[in-house]
Amino acid sequence: MLAISYMRDEIAPRLQEIFHAEQSAAPITQKEGTEATPLVKEKPAPQQVESPSTPRTAKTATSIKPIAMPELPQMQSAKENYITTHSCGEVRNYTVCYSSIHHSPLWVAAPMHRSYEGDTKRKDNYTFDPTLPVNVQTRLNSSYGEYTRGHMLGSAERNASRELNDQTFYVTNIAPQLREGFNQMGGAWNNLESFVDKQVCADTLYLVTGAIYEPYTDSNGELIPARTTINKNDEQEVGVPTAYYKVMLRTRSGKTGRSIAECTSEELKCAAFIVGHRSAKGRKPSAEDMLSVRELELLTGIDFFATVPHAPETEADPKDWGL
């Protein structure tokens, strides 16, 4: 059970800290229990994102205010996209950006720490997200048909309590995934999830899991075209991702005992991994699948770790991640 009273921001980040965030966390506009609103990006003057050609400089963060939700991305507003944050009491679970066009998530951002893990058993109770309009969601009582129901934030990563786990079964956290060679039994995505799980440390790991729906050329040169599927549960057309990615930010040592804001850029590391949505049993994370965060930003148009100006987003060294 989560020891809420004794957790720091870096151990089990608190939802209440949203209200103490700097203006750069402003994309989250709704509170828990209210209807989600379309994503709106606000560019704060103190932490504007540099152009891709401008290098980030190493700087200490001792004078920076606490960063409430370091994992949050920012992106251009679009009326078809909705974001909402789910929490359990004072402890936040995850934030999702959901596309009402694809009827599937664009990204899910979450803090990762062993304190979120326990022995709660999954119930597979796939249900509508109570904070979004039902008419923009798709029903998932069973699999899509051709594709399995793939978690963006895994059920196994949130089993410290019943409520934490149940929230991972909201349909806004689910996207179509190939079963064989991808989602299960040593598939490419299954192996990447295992790799990311090994990066969880004493300090908090900040993670964004995302999906791409435009045509994508995988690292082996295979072009994966844009596609859709008909969800057999409600006959709704659902976008099928052409690629999935994970973006990570954490301290290098993993055991500083300090918040991200208190660390220098030299004490941090971040990287992105992307895999084409195709059957590739045995495929494991490699340097070929690795990008710098800045490179993924150029590919997706999303500003990752937007509230962490000293994150080393232009760096991506495979050796830093044991590759």
List each model region and its residues.
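Domain-level detector for secreted/extracellular nuclease and nuclease-toxin modules, and
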Residues: M1-L323
